[in-house]
Amino acid sequence: MNREFEGKKLLILGGNPETTPLVQIANDMGIKTIVTSGRSTDHAKKAAWKAYDVDGMDVDGLIKLAKSEKVDGVLVGVADILVPSYCKVCGALGLPCYATEKIVEVFSFKDKFKETCEKYGVHGIPEYKLDADCKREDLDKIVYPVMVKPVDNGGGVGMTVAYNEEELLEGVKKALDASYKKRFIVERYMQCDDVGIYYSFKDGVCSVSCIYDRYTTDEQVGFSKVNLGSVYPSRHIEDYFRNMHDNAVRMFGDIGIQNGVLLLSGFYEDGEFYMYDPGFRLQGEAPHLLMKAIHGFDQREMLIRFALTGSQGDFDIREIDDVRFRGKSAATLWFLLKKGKIKEISGLEKAENDPRIVANVQRLNVGDTVEEDWIGTERQVLTRLYIICDSREELKNCIKEYEDTVKVVSDDGADMLLNGLNTDLI
């Protein structure tokens, strides 16, 4: 690996397990990584050159830390909520930042995102008017079920599916508790195909790197649907380019996106796409791991280079991207856990020598406890397997193989795994 940045210091905001691969790549590039977050036990800190407990929301504390360490660059990890801090810290230090205040305003708050999308003909999920006062005239207009969620949190945090008014009012309280801005939205609960659209931006050029179909669990009634797996490329690619792409690119240009990566999560129904969640940073889904294996370039290296130089490198993103994955079929396979303490994990060891598995990003280990308030969020993910096969049928067989093999037992002897992805739906 190129080590042209040997000895440079990079401050990375956020320490969750999904940020660990970013830290590891920077380490491999010879960079001195400094990870900071509010929890001393965060996973990514174990891989860092240095670690601090300055919370990612403490902008003044982050600026002070960056100055004391004389860092050469700052980069946000896999956390939507830290993108505003990233922008402010870089601005105060005069360091490269792929986000701007306008971009942060649009992509860090779901209500502002939806408002912006509609101006460009990019649809958001149908929404009901409701504020913290929960006025009777507004409540009477709501048709259930609905999804209640904070405008400024992700990964399922603070989200509730409500089937009646009592559950709605409880969901409002939960969403407000999880919102730093104390704002929430109430949307129609969509029961249709779920998709992710992942973009790469370089010097103002927008490239669609991948589009995938998400398959979520319906086992946890009343909670946000957590992903069971994603399949690449999506069966809805043609409809995307026919019905949404041009409007989306026009919106990105007017917002002022020049560099970086962006995921738009959405639903597909009757030929139309309804966007519900943007993420202007590397994703927990980590499609960049599949892209590294298939496209041959690594978005992590690209963003690290930008943080240290203000340039993502000398290449044409349109020449190396391929939204159709060069004819391959790929997937991320998520294993979700029920509440309990992990006593035993088996079946994952075979992934180490399986050429179909390009990565295994494990979040939890023996001795860890899945708490009640983790249910319905990505914190209940045991691990994600990244699979690449030559055909869709081979991919389905690989998924079945690992779902039959992987076992997780709690300290009271119970099976902790939720039901997996039904490959008949692929």
Regions found by a protein language model. Give the residues of each.
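Conserved ATP-binding module of the ATP-grasp superfamily
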Residues: 123-125, 145-148, 159-192, 212, ...
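A conserved helix-loop-beta module that forms one wall/lid of the active-site cleft
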Residues: 91-158
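ATP-binding N-terminal substructure of ATP-dependent carboxylate-amine bond-forming enzymes
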Residues: 1-103, 134, 310-311, 337, ...
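Short beta-strand-to-turn element immediately C-terminal to the catalytic PLP-Schiff-base lysine
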Residues: 130, 159-164, 200-202, 269
